[in-house]
């Protein structure tokens, strides 16, 4: 009777359980049955239901990323569709939490993934961008997910500027995320050359007021101190510098090469860790370990195309990226960069033999050099053969006996005569040498007249 009394006191419905298991009626019934049998666990089940509801609400409010399709590339270049069941690359709760700041810079111009001015923030675990009006965090990335950070001069600007490119894991345009994991976006922002105007440490102290450190160097230092897996990479003259100087800033060297990917115009940067094509979405970064081969096609008098075959780290399938309309003036520098880093130059491979250099009758500077190099190699083989032949002749001359061929007047002898000579050598070499010596002396003294003197007169 006591059990029946307790059982009847259990409410027929508990709001938390109803909300948590509304989509699972069978599971909800089992929860109620368990509470009926052990009423003392009712509060525990209710707490579990509340926690389940909070998880469902967090997943439901997770942002759904749109599909980005690159029309001028293979199917692997499509960004994967992400849905509410996908596990985000970072927890939005952690990203937006009020953790202590280590650095922030106001009025920073972002270009990717959004074009607007935001506040750049670096916390103990995240790099993020905060809306300056609403104070909401717009986007960000965990610091330990960042694989590459680049600081590159912005091409074709009258005022010198630098683009910082943050490339998280699976955001390089080559490697796709695992199934069910959201593909993160690359992040690009711009800073002007000169001292920072609104940069602060985590405690609010303004940085760069002594004018000893430019804005780009300050941001680079902060990132290098904060990033656990990588460092900031900048262009290096020892890697590549364009043959054409910066058009809008006279006297300044250019580190970019203008190119097209399909109809999209952009810039190629050849760096110490890989090749970047930017700065519009989607950025593509070819780390050296993902480059399968690089070749040249459509080599014309003024332009050529660069083909990069990339292989994702966790896949054997390759993707091909073509960058067109590259100025011939940069052919030599690009080719030197490719050879320096041991990237496979497959332009002469069998599969590309129809698209070899000089396909349209034009010859680039490095192509001519390559042909000359091949000629040198070919010539060296001929020289080697000639040298071996000359060495053999030298050996024959060392073994040559001046008197042995006098009977033939230098015209050589038949094989039968050689056999006779061998037999005569066995019988008595000394006598033959004396006789031949006498004949040689007579010929020496009389010259051509020796032919007219009868033997008996001698």
Curated annotation (Swiss-Prot):
One of its GO terms (cellular component) is chromosome. Residues 82-95 have a biased composition (Polar residues). It is found in: Nucleus; Chromosome. Keywords: Chaperone, Chromosome, DNA-binding, Nucleus, Transcription, Transcription regulation. The keyword Kinase does not apply. The keyword Methyltransferase does not apply. Residues 71-95, 359-458 are annotated as: Disordered. One of its GO terms (molecular function) is DNA binding. SMART domains: Rtt106. Residues 367-380, 390-408, 415-437, 446-458 have a biased composition (Acidic residues). It holds the Pfam family Rttp106-like_middle. It comes from the Eukaryota. Interacts with histones H3 and H4. PANTHER family: FACT COMPLEX SUBUNIT SSRP1, HISTONE CHAPERONE RTT106. Belongs to the RTT106 family. Histones H3 and H4 chaperone involved in the nucleosome formation and heterochromatin silencing. Required for the deposition of H3K56ac-carrying H3-H4 complex onto newly-replicated DNA. Plays a role in the transcriptional regulation of the cell-cycle dependent histone genes by creating a repressive structure at the core histone gene promoter. This is Histone chaperone rtt106. It comes from Aspergillus niger (strain ATCC MYA-4892 / CBS 513.88 / FGSC A1513). The lineage of its organism: Eukaryota, Fungi, Dikarya, Ascomycota, Pezizomycotina. The gene is rtt106.
